[in-house]
Amino acid sequence: MNQTTTYLEFKTDLFANTFFDVIKKYHDYEVCCEGKLWVPFSYFTHENNITLKYSNQHDEELTLVLEKKNERINATSIVKNKYVEDGTDAFYFIDAFQEVMFDAYFLKE
């Protein structure tokens, strides 16, 4: 199991709130990362927390936990690999996820 934690920091909590709302709205988007297509299959939200679960074509599962605190959104991804590699899936997924959400915000909103 590979785990990575990072964060997005915004200038104000208004921007963080807006981006958090975008994630809630577009939580069902697929994420392509490192040649794998991650498809969402579970979504849970409670106050300032969002938990998303994804699976891919290799029967791997990934859990993304997002927590908003003021102008920062903490993101933790946990990948359950069938064959544990170097741990990069978890890190690259967060980057790919951010890109998908930013695209959704700027292209759809």
Q: Regions from the language model: what does each represent?
A:
Residues 2-3, 14, 70:
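Asparagine-rich low-complexity intrinsically disordered tracts
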Residues 5, 24-27, 41-42, 52, ...:
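Intrinsically disordered, low-complexity segments enriched in small/polar residues
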Residues 6-7, 14, 47, 52-53, ...:
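Serine/threonine-rich, low-complexity intrinsically disordered segments
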Residues 7-10, 79-109:
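Mixed-charge, Lys/Arg-enriched low-complexity segments
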Residues 10-31:
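Amphipathic alpha-helical segments
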Residues 24-28, 33-68:
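Amphipathic, interaction-prone secondary-structure segments
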Residues 56-92:
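Intrinsically disordered, low-complexity regulatory segments enriched in Ser/Thr/Pro
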